[in-house]
Amino acid sequence: MFDYQQPDARGHFGIYGGSFVAETLSHALDELNAAYERYRHDPEFIAEFRNELAHFVGRPSPVYHAARMSREVGGAQIYLKREDLNHTGAHKINNTIGQALLARRMGKPRVIAETGAGQHGVATATICARYGMECVVYMGSEDVKRQSPNVYRMNLLGARVVPVESGSKTLKDALNEAMRDWVTNVENTFYIIGTVAGPHPYPAMVRDFQRVIGDECLVQMPALAGRQPDAVVACVGGGSNAMGIFYPYIPHEGVRLIGVEAAGEGMESGKHSASLQRGSPGVLHGNRTYVLQDANGQITETHSVSAGLDYPGVGPEHAYLKDIGRAEYVGITDAEALQAFHYLCRAEGIIPALESSHAVAYAMKLAKTMRPDQHVLVNLSGRGDKDIGTVADLSGADFYCRPSCRGQSVKGGDPSVVEIQRKAGGVQ
């Protein structure tokens, strides 16, 4: 078994991680770290967290043998860890519950979050509604446009969504604005970071809340397939779904861990988000990791068809796993991800998120190189309802999200109903 004890007491994964923040946030991070270290071993906290996962989220999520897909692709058997079946439609809810429980115990009534694909924003808004907490979500204006269904979900759940117009108007910029908010309102505000990035203790804390994914797989795979998988595949943007399934498997040296980054329009095009393959060590959002940057250390523009992978950095633990050779990282282009999206819809009746489609696409490639008695486990991190508008646009489909898109009135569009919606916050 591979001996793995990371991070160290200061939040370092080898040379990565740590805490590079303004002095105004140092106290808040120390306070958060102390609270996490206290409650992570507290039986009452653990019991409440597990109860919420079981009865609010619907865990454990199943592992599903994609038999038709395996047969048609050829080679190894492909299994899907169905995080798309969680309440809110992705893995993000696992982490938001853990952090919201911490926020309540720390007496922080206001919660902020950043979001790219919108799934972390929806998960945060959901748990804030459940616990009666104020919720503000920062989202790049480009992502607001391409993930509009999730923006409306957040509004329905009572969150205030703040479009970010600076920079590339995507996840990186949303995270910047959330950090600025936290500095200003640190006394009453808890920042729920959605991925395994940010300053210590966030990378380890988010990983620990997400490890339930891999812990379940350790039990489910032997029951379903007779043994552990030969390879575990997950998409990597910031990397929380990947760390969630990778972490429990790190000691199992016979299991390959493969992270799939967004190769966008191709690695040589410059239009991608593959920080582990094309980046270099640098500091971003409070931690040292692999970053896409120019010769002067300026963050470069990224691209992915998937909003959740459109990020110029990655969690520091992924950087460490790459350097020590325990995990490997590959790229999948927009075109390959879209092809896998459509294939999984038709072959298995599952509509995956575009983020997850990157992992599915690589798993299909990998399976072909393996024997039929081998197994590939894919973390299907989220469902694709949020992406159907984007996919329709890219495929040229005649898709309309609602009758009003065609200039038609909506059935039941009575003025009194609209006024009720307006008062409820549904119409701005």
From Swiss-Prot:
Family under the similarity heading: Belongs to the TrpB family.
Cited InterPro entries: Trp_synth_b_CS (IPR006653), Trp_synth_beta (IPR006654), Trp_synth_beta/beta-like (IPR023026), TrpB-like_PALP (IPR001926), TrpB-like_PALP_sf (IPR036052)
GO CC terms, sorted: cytoplasm
Record-listed N6-(pyridoxal phosphate)lysine modification sites: K92
Classification via CDD domains: Trp-synth_B
Pathway: Amino-acid biosynthesis; L-tryptophan biosynthesis; L-tryptophan from chorismate: step 5/5
Co-factor requirement: pyridoxal 5'-phosphate
Catalytic activity: (1S,2R)-1-C-(indol-3-yl)glycerol 3-phosphate + L-serine = D-glyceraldehyde 3-phosphate + L-tryptophan + H2O
Organism of provenance: Leptothrix cholodnii (strain ATCC 51168 / LMG 8142 / SP-6)
Key words of the record: Amino-acid biosynthesis, Aromatic amino acid biosynthesis, Lyase, Pyridoxal phosphate, Tryptophan biosynthesis
PANTHER family to which the protein is assigned, alphabetical: TRYPTOPHAN SYNTHASE (PTHR48077:SF3), TRYPTOPHAN SYNTHASE-RELATED (PTHR48077)
NCBIfam families hit by this protein: trpB
EC numbers on record: 4.2.1.20
UniProt cross-references to HAMAP family, sorted A to Z: Trp_synth_beta
Role, per record: The beta subunit is responsible for the synthesis of L-tryptophan from indole and L-serine.
Subunit structure: Tetramer of two alpha and two beta chains.
Leader sequence residues: none
One function term, GO molecular function aspect: tryptophan synthase activity
Record-given protein name: Tryptophan synthase beta chain
Gene: trpB
Gene3D superfamilies the record matches: 3.40.50.1100
